[in-house]
Amino acid sequence: MQVAFYKGRKRLFNRLTSWWLRGPYSHVELVLGYDQAGQAICASSSMMDGGVRVKHMTLNPDHWDVVSASGSADAAWAWLRKHEGAGYDYLGLLGFVARAIGHDKSRFVCSEAVAEMLGMADGWRFDPCSLYAALAWRESSAVAAAA
C-alpha cells in the first residue's frame, strides 16, 4: 500500500498547519489503488469533504510525497466500511494545538484515519508529520529485520 502526504501550500490553512506542525505536511491520504484513468483511489478524513471518505485523485508530485507502507488493503477497506461518512474531528484538529483538549472518538482527522486503516494503535496521536516519521521508522525497521 501507499500513503500520500500533502505538501502543497495553496491554501492558507495548509500553510498554517504545516507551520504549526513544524514540518512540510498538512494532510495525508491512504492510497488503496489506482483506477483505469490512472487516478489514485484515496481514503482519509477531510475537512473540505466533511469527514471520512474515498476519493479519486491525481497526486501531482509537486504537491504530494507518496511512500510505501505495510498494511492490509482488506483491513483498510473493512475500516472504511465501518467508518465511511463519520464526521471530521474538529476537536482533534484543535488537539494538534493543545493535546490536552483530546478528540471526538466518533470523528476523525486525516492522520488518525490513515493510521487506523494501516492498523496502527492510538491513531488519534498522529498528525501528518508525525505519521510520516512513524511510517519511515516502521518501514526501515522492517527492512533491517529482514536483512
Language-model features, listed with the residues they occupy:
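Activation targets extended, charge/polar-rich intrinsically disordered C-terminal tails
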Residues: L93-A147
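Alpha-helix C-terminal capping segments
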Residues: M57, V66-S70, A113-G119
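Exposed alpha-helical structural elements
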Residues: L12-R15, A75, W79, S130
